[in-house]
């Protein structure tokens, strides 16, 4: 467990294409939580390393991660006659989990209905109860069998330029403004593995994963 000055640059995070903007975690299981319901979401959004304790999270506006960020940032007064939001909190807890049971990866990319948590679906796929545990520095539950867990928070409203990234279309995606994860802890198994995939024009590893 690294809580004092954690450093994600110690991890074997690859840079796969010459013009990529940096090193990217390409199989990240990003955990966020709805502040209203407490339900967790597991999504796969590429993560660019900015430094020892800063990571960009490439979640688009239609993804659950972005929806949870909006919910943390604002709350609507049910008695109000307008929909003007009121600022709730400046930070949102986030965890990036790497490795663990393969059903977690499938659950993170599956188009599940909003009322079905990825953790529950992963347990269904594995035909067993998925073991989860509390994160050590953030108010989140994370898979107990993950090889590596990067914990931190997003300062709501803070963005930095992420990219470019060699994508599955065969071109580099453009740079864009995305949230920054500030790392508060890194936990890992003693025999941790660091799974990764190379993204590019099919046929590539990520294409076979998508077909599966």
Where are the model-predicted features located?
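Extended, highly charged
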Residues: 1-78, 84-180, 184-212
């Amino acid at each position: 467990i690294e809580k004092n000055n954690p450093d994600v640059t110690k991890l074997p995070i690859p840079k796969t294409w010459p013009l990529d903007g940096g090193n990217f975690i390409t199989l990240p299981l990003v955990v966020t939580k709805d502040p209203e319901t407490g339900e967790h979401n597991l999504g796969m959004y590429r993560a660019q390393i900015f430094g020892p304790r800063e990571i960009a999270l490439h979640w688009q506006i239609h993804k659950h991660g972005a929806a949870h960020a909006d919910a943390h940032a604002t709350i609507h007064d049910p008695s109000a006659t307008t929909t003007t939001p009121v600022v709730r909190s400046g930070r949102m807890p986030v965890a990036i989990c790497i490795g663990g049971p393969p059903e977690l990866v499938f659950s993170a990319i599956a188009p599940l209905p909003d009322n079905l948590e990825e953790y529950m679906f992963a347990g269904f796929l594995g035909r067993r109860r998925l073991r989860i545990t509390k994160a050590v520095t953030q108010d989140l539950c994370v898979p107990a069998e993950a090889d590596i867990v990067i914990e931190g928070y997003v300062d709501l409203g803070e963005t930095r330029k992420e990219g470019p990234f060699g994508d599955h279309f065969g071109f580099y995606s453009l740079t864009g403004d995305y949230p920054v994860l500030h790392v508060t802890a890194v936990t890992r198994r003693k025999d941790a593995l660091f799974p990764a995939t190379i993204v590019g024009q099919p046929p590539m590893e990520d294409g076979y994963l998508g077909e599966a």
